[in-house]
Amino acid sequence: MDSKDDLDLKAQELINEARSRVTELDETAKLLLFKAARSFNGWKKNTVSDDQLREIYDLLKLCPTSANVCPIRIKFIRSKTAKELLQPILFEANRAKTMDAPVVAILGNDYAFFEHNSFLAPHKPQGIADRMRENPQLVAPWANLNGTLQAAYFIMAVRAVGLDAGPMQGLDKEAADRAFWEGTEVKTNFICSVGYGDETTVFKKLPRFEFDQVCEFL
């Protein structure tokens, strides 16, 4: 049996082991991730560790994308110098709350994502790369779809490690590209403040559609 088959079997064993330990999240976990989770505008002074930020990425990278591509790129803004570079790029209404966050993640989409195809999809090392080069009009849709999908996983991973997220679009993205992604094919998607949210800054939750308004059984 070759090494690929061994890896396949190990992957199957891991799934079976996980299912033997847990079949669904309990209500406490659902509260943390969904029901009581909010987008925060204010932050406590607690620090966020490097290990927490690494764990966030290590969780989101496991989630599915098209053909296992990985367009997401992340700049974790923490230092005074980096925040000073970010501040004028933010829309004025968002500056104070963003600068107050212990960490601000700039989430970008790498339009050269397909150059890593041989590593991420070794079973078809040139498949996606050839497709993108032959059909360049597909690059932006693929990068934006999968990068945004990974950015959504990012928010859930932030919550999963016990932190809070404050995602927002309110910045000059072209200026952010020049400031933080110069010399690359990365385009800014949005930013997300990360830290321990101050509950006193939260407003009432806005309405959501009910199941029957957006879903249908066929």
List each language-model region with its residue ranges.
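Acidic, surface-exposed loops and disordered segments
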Residues: 1-218
